Amino acid sequence: MMDAQVQAHPLDVADHLAVACQRWNKRRAIYRPAGEPFDPSRCSVQPIEEAQAKAFVVSMHYSGTYPAARFRAGVFIKERFARERLAGVGVFSVPMNQKVVPRYFPGLTPNEGIELGRLVLSDELAANAESWALARMRRLLSKALPEVRGIVAYCDPVERRDERGELVKRGHIGTIYKASNATYQGRSSARTLWMA
């Protein structure tokens, strides 16, 4: 019998996410219908300060944590007759250890790579905004840190449940990374992670 660890079969996750776009709101998964039209004309992506990025990510992302950032960008939304407001954050961070970048990008030094530590968009943005936002964040990253030639991003197909066994996070299979021409490099080491 498994206690608070319940693993979803990757195909179950893929079937679910084929019809929905996963987002986070107050650390809980929510979903936008896949295929809804995204209007980029009312959005912009800009570099943002650490404090603003951290406050957004910690309040929205399921983990409630913030990585060691090297670069941060925000997605801003502007409604008619309203002030522009933050609706998403991408955090490009220091990888967990010095071996990550050379492992996935042979020939690069650790400083020539970066990890996409967090990408969190609020449910205010229509589905499919992720790939649009990520492309613009990557352009800004290239200007801010021209030495960076590789980005590592992880997807996590395993569900997370709280101490009561309630679903906190469905897994995801990296659809936005595929849409951004990322190359799948396989699984990282298996581990057990208990969330309090």
Regions found by a protein language model. Give the residues of each.
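Eukaryotic non-globular interaction segments with acidic/serine-rich, low-complexity composition
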Residues: 1-7, 114, 130
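Charged, low-complexity intrinsically disordered segments and flexible loops
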Residues: 2-34, 38
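Short amphipathic alpha-helix that is part of the acyltransferase structural core
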Residues: 26-68
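Sequence-level motif detector for i,i+2 pairs with an aromatic at +2
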Residues: 40-43, 70, 87, 111
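Acyl-donor binding region in acyl/amide transferases
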Residues: 44-47, 93-196
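Conserved beta-hairpin
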Residues: 57, 70-94
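Short beta-turn/strand-loop junction motif enriched in small, turn-promoting residues
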Residues: 62-63, 80, 121
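A short, compositionally biased
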Residues: 68-70, 189
